[in-house]
């Protein structure tokens, strides 16, 4: 591996390459030069890779994302005050109140939707009452919601019937009373 020899050489076949490799490795001086060349190439590649990575992080601004936010250097203080937890937050829960836009009453937030539904007359029961009221004001020829028609109908909302409990049989008796 002289100074004026080309670095990249094309070989006709594999045997020619192996022959030349064995010639270089037989000479201790050439072996040392090859090892130094290999080491220099690896170190150059490593340094170049790190330089490109740092340059890319700087140009894209991703270096700050990798580093993260610096930690707060001041020590954490423990708060010892009434109605406060150790971090200084208020530990008493305050109920949130809402004002009804219809009647201007103050209502707890958890009860606001049911209150507004009843206050504005838009609940389930209100619509049923309104349907009944409309049906009652119409003439008697209309069968929509008439009370007298409902008297003969079966009551579907009635009580559930209890199932009869079958008597417990002993091992020797059968259903018709005969024993085996």
Curated annotation (Swiss-Prot):
Keywords: Activator, Chromatin regulator, Metal-binding, Nucleus, Transcription, Transcription regulation, Zinc, Zinc-finger. A zinc finger (SGF11-type) spans 98-119. GO terms for molecular function: transcription coactivator activity; zinc ion binding. The keyword RNA-binding does not apply. One of its GO terms (cellular component) is DUBm complex. It is found in: Nucleus. One of its GO terms (biological process) is regulation of transcription by RNA polymerase II. Pfam families: Sgf11. Residues 138-180 are annotated as: Disordered. Residues 146-156 have a biased composition (Acidic residues). The long N-terminal helix forms part of the 'assembly lobe' of the SAGA deubiquitination module. Component of some SAGA transcription coactivator-HAT complexes. Within the SAGA complex, participates in a subcomplex of SAGA called the DUB module (deubiquitination module). Belongs to the SGF11 family. Component of the transcription regulatory histone acetylation (HAT) complex SAGA, a multiprotein complex that activates transcription by remodeling chromatin and mediating histone acetylation and deubiquitination. Within the SAGA complex, participates in a subcomplex that specifically deubiquitinates histone H2B. The SAGA complex is recruited to specific gene promoters by activators, where it is required for transcription. This is SAGA-associated factor 11 homolog. It comes from Aedes aegypti (Yellowfever mosquito). The gene is Sgf11.
């Amino acid at each position: 591996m002289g100074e004026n020899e080309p670095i990249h050489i094309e070989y006709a076949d594999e045997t020619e390459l192996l022959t030349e490799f064995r010639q270089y490795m037989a000479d201790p001086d050439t072996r040392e030069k090859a090892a130094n060349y290999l080491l220099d190439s690896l170190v150059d590649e490593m340094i170049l890779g790190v330089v490109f990575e740092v340059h890319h992080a700087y140009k894209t601004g991703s270096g700050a994302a990798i580093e993260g936010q610096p930690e707060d250097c001041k020590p954490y203080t423990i708060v010892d005050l009434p109605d406060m937890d150790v971090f200084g937050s208020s530990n008493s829960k305050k109920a949130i109140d809402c004002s009804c836009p219809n009647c201007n009453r103050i209502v707890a937030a958890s009860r606001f939707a049911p209150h507004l539904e009843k206050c504005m007359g838009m609940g389930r029961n209100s619509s049923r009452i309104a349907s009944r009221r409309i049906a009652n004001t119409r003439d008697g020829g209309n069968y929509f919601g008439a009370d007298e028609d409902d008297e003969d109908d079966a009551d579907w909302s009635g009580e559930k019937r209890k199932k009869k409990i079958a008597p417990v049989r002993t091992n020797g008796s059968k259903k018709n009373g005969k024993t085996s």
